[in-house]
Curated annotation (Swiss-Prot):
Source taxonomy: Viruses, Riboviria, Orthornavirae, Negarnaviricota, Polyploviricotina
Listed EC numbers: 3.2.1.18
Description of how the protein assembles with itself and partners: Homotetramer.
Entry keywords, A to Z: Calcium, Disulfide bond, Glycoprotein, Glycosidase, Host cell membrane, Host membrane, Hydrolase, Membrane, Metal-binding, Signal-anchor, Transmembrane, Transmembrane helix, Virion
Stretches of the chain found on the membrane's Intravirion side: 1-6
GO molecular function, one term: exo-alpha-sialidase activity
InterPro entries referenced in this protein's UniProt entry, alphabetically: Glyco_hydro_34, Sialidase_Influenza_A/B, Sialidase_sf
UniProt KW Hydrolase keyword: yes
Keyword Membrane carried by entry: yes
UniProt name for this protein: Neuraminidase
Listed Pfam families: Neur (PF00064)
Catalytic activity, reaction form: Hydrolysis of alpha-(2->3)-, alpha-(2->6)-, alpha-(2->8)- glycosidic linkages of terminal sialic acid residues in oligosaccharides, glycoproteins, glycolipids, colominic acid and synthetic substrates
Topology with respect to the bilayer: Single-pass type II membrane protein
Location(s) in or outside the cell: Virion membrane; Host apical cell membrane
């Protein structure tokens, strides 16, 4: 091959390589453009690990979904009409409880970024159920988790995440600064109630759709506190119960009626010798029933029921199947406070069905361990200790904690009745275990009129963590 032929051959090869390279670059540009068009153009594509954020604009829901793709957030929107959660239906007839969620927050938090929390509770709109919780401004297995056994601090905040997920900075939404809280949905937007401030002058901040709409000042200057579970909404109005005063003596109790986040009416209960704290409230046939904690002198639970005009009735669950902790062994009940082992207590709940009652309680009579559901067909009004159903939820050898009620409205379930549900806090760490922190995970169950099973669904995290050693 002479020199001219070599030059022509080499030039031809270079030209072919250049053309191929140019075609590859053009193909790459087209591929990137098509991929970007698909990501930004598809308004209805479901992606895993989406975070849905609901905003309220001109009486129309806008469901904003931030889809994480290659560390870039692309915003998609679709309008969802608001409704009114009527709350006029009766509780659904049930025969037992089906497991609904379990977040395993402590187990996941040994290696992942999970908030140190307490007082978790669940509330549902007509679109979704969310877990609300009070953080300590710290993560598990981190130095700031030290000393988080304390109930009230300026670092505590109310946050929420999708039900069943471990609460982390990546899936959680800030709601309010609070060391005591409640939240509920009226069919249009979320109402949150967050109490913070000094013990002798705390203030409850009400937010509607994330915007401050009202405040409630402590009226007895003695640790204003509220439910630590969902408020209850009927026909566009939402209701909550607050306490102000001693935790071991006569205190003051008020019911508040709120509309679009503003207090429109309140009434103070005339309840001498009663003690109401941390009420678990639910709607039933257009009225509200709350079952609460007596931290003063009752090992059975006090209740208050009221209509939308705040006309109320009060009493104690009469059953000899006692619902508080600590408590005596089951025996003869009373429609007033049962005094033996009546001091102190734990947040709890019950569901009234006529003269009968579903009672949720710890299995242990003197520690926050184990959990069970008991059906006493005459327990709301009768004082004997007989019952017909017991369903195991957590074994007595495993820790439990607070528990509370929530409901699923027909607008969510498609049923013609209000489904009763409950959650159980599974407390881990101090003061019972050798850690520097106190936190918890949670489980939840909903009532069904079909097959169910009793078992134990414990937290089951292996302690201590690295930070504790």
């Amino acid at each position: 091959m002479n020199p001219n032929q070599k030059i022509i051959t080499i030039g031809s090869i270079c030209m072919v390589v250049g053309i191929i390279s140019l075609m590859l670059q053009i193909g790459n540009i087209i591929s990137i453009w098509v991929s970007h068009s698909i990501q930004t153009g598809n308004q209805h594509q479901a992606e895993p690990c989406n975070q849905s954020i609901i905003t309220y604009e001109n009486n129309t829901w806008v469901n904003q979904t931030y889809v994480n793709i290659s560390n870039t957030n692309f915003l998609t929107e679709k309008a969802v009409a608001s409704v009114t959660l009527a709350g006029n239906s009766s509780l659904c007839p049930i025969s037992g409880w089906a497991v609904h969620s379990k977040d395993n927050g402590i187990r996941i938090g040994s290696k992942g970024d999970v908030f140190v929390i307490r007082e978790p509770f669940i509330s549902c709109s007509h679109l979704e159920c969310r877990t609300f919780f009070l953080t300590q401004g710290a993560l598990l297995n981190d130095k700031h988790s030290n000393g988080t056994v304390k109930d009230r601090s300026p670092h505590r905040t109310l946050m929420s995440c999708p039900v069943g997920e471990a609460p982390s900075p990546y899936n959680s939404r800030f709601e309010s600064v609070a060391w005591s809280a409640s939240a509920c949905h009226d069919g249009t937007s979320w109402l949150t109630i967050g109490i913070s401030g000094p013990d002798n002058g705390a203030v409850a901040v009400l937010k509607y759709n994330g915007i401050i709409t009202d405040t409630i000042k402590s009226w007895r200057n003695n640790i204003l506190r509220t439910q630590e579970s969902e408020c209850a909404c009927v026909n566009g109005s939402c209701f909550t119960v607050m306490t102000d005063g001693p935790s071991n003596g006569q205190a003051s109790y008020k019911i508040f009626k709120m509309e679009k986040g503003k207090v429109v009416k309140s009434v103070e209960l005339n309840a001498p010798n009663y003690h109401y704290e941390e009420c678990s409230c639910y709607p039933d046939a257009g009225e509200i029933t709350c079952v609460c904690r007596d931290n003063w002198h009752g090992s059975n639970r006090p209740w208050v029921s009221f209509n939308q005009n705040l006309e109320y009735q009060i009493g104690y669950i009469c059953s000899g199947v006692f619902g508080d902790n600590p408590r005596p062994n089951d025996g003869t009940g009373s429609c007033g406070p049962v005094s033996p082992n009546g001091a102190y207590g734990v947040k709890g709940f019950s569901f009234k069905y006529g003269n009968g009652v579903w009672i949720g309680r710890t299995k242990s009579t003197n520690s926050r361990s184990g959990f069970e559901m008991i059906w006493d067909p005459n327990g709301w009004t009768g004082t004997d200790s007989s019952f017909s159903v017991k369903q195991d939820i957590v074994a007595i050898t495993d820790w439990s904690g607070y528990s509370g009620s929530f409901v699923q409205h027909p607008e969510l379930t498609g049923l013609d009745c209000i489904r009763p549900c409950f959650w159980v806090e599974l407390i881990r760490g101090r003061p019972k275990e050798s850690t520097i922190w106190t936190s918890g995970s949670s489980i939840s169950f909903c009532g069904v009129n079909s097959d169910t099973v009793g078992w134990s669904w414990p937290d089951d995290a292996e302690l201590p963590f690295t930070i504790d050693k």
